[in-house]
Amino acid sequence: MNAKIKVLLVDDSAVVRQVLQQVLERDKNIEVIGAAADPIFAQLRMSKQWPDVIVLDVEMPRMDGITFLKKLMAERPTPVVMCSTLTSKGAQTSMKALAAGAVAVVAKPAVGVKEYLESAAGELIMEIKAAAKANMRNMPAATASAQSMALPAKFSADAVIPLRTGGVIAGANKIAALGTSTGGTQALEYVLTRLPRNCPGIVIVQHMPEKFTAAFAERLNSICELEILEAESGHQVAPGRALIAPGGKHMLLRRSGAQYFVEIMSGPPVNRHRPSVDVLFRSVAQAAGRNALGVIMTGMGDDGAKGLLEMRNAGALTIGQDERSCIVYGMPKEAAKIGAVTREISLERIPQCVLDMGASLTASAQRG
């Protein structure tokens, strides 16, 4: 029998601590070993028993969550799931938490927290289980995914975009599609900061809630040569530009002649995610086919696996991040299981692979 995941709760609200403990202990695989009102009390509790995962509030007395997180990562890296309010200020704070080493950030409302946590326990439990599997050796300064807490029914990409065979236009621009979840912000930062402005146009799904993706895109845009934007319907996918799907919406690739653009739309969560990697990858398979490169990276679950297989069947080049370099080897593993991955490579090799494969796509288009 597998050992339970030992969780420590750190939040200055007694109500939140009580509700969190109640909802988490409904899962037979989780054991709450303590609840602390602030990081000072948390450190005392950790001196007696070290947790597998820490659920940490951001704003607390005596020491704020970001300061404690930085201290923890410097002394003994431990998976941390941060709780942040779903506001513009909370989104900026979440980016600081990810940069400081949080494995995941979950959103909570500014009001009605008790009712929200009780109704949305499933997503928090899923994040804790993903965090418990995180390979902290691969966790440098920046990391992780942020997700909304509602756990919806599991729909397939059919609920958003019908399956069909797409055509390919010779001479159409090359494009790269990236999909990732837990550990993804760190991985995406690594890849995007190493790409020049003449790289292929890029479309990205990173599992993240509404309001958080804009802050994520803004941060990346400030440190990359590429133009990084939170996508809007009609945005053109052009060389030197990366478009990130907005939280709470699906992103689809469309084609007009030899040019690509994106469509942002609502619809049910697919594989319990909105945006969904499967939705993006299916649309890329249909719009770009063999003119595309698909990359599935670190993350929990199977979102993107079927879509990547559709890309491969449409003639696209497909790669998966290898287990050694993943924070959580879930999505690439599931894609490899069903034959969707042409080959697996380390995170360190992905930027050059994007450039090399982009060059080969250009050569193929010129020959065609």
Curated annotation (Swiss-Prot):
SMART domains in the cross-refs: REC
UniProt-listed Enzyme Commission number(s): 3.1.1.61, 3.5.1.44
Response regulatory domain segment(s): 6-123
Active-site annotation: 181, 207, 303
Chief location bin: cytoplasm
Post-translational modification: Phosphorylated by CheA. Phosphorylation of the N-terminal regulatory domain activates the methylesterase activity.
Domain of life of the native organism: Bacteria
Chain positions with 4-aspartylphosphate modification: 57
Residue ranges of domain CheB-type methylesterase in the record: 169-355
One annotated GO biological process: chemotaxis
Role of this protein: Involved in chemotaxis. Part of a chemotaxis signal transduction system that modulates chemotaxis in response to various stimuli. Catalyzes the demethylation of specific methylglutamate residues introduced into the chemoreceptors (methyl-accepting chemotaxis proteins or MCP) by CheR. Also mediates the irreversible deamidation of specific glutamine residues to glutamic acid.
UniProt name for this protein: Protein-glutamate methylesterase/protein-glutamine glutaminase 2
Lineage: Bacteria, Pseudomonadati, Pseudomonadota, Gammaproteobacteria, Oceanospirillales
Gene (name only): cheB2
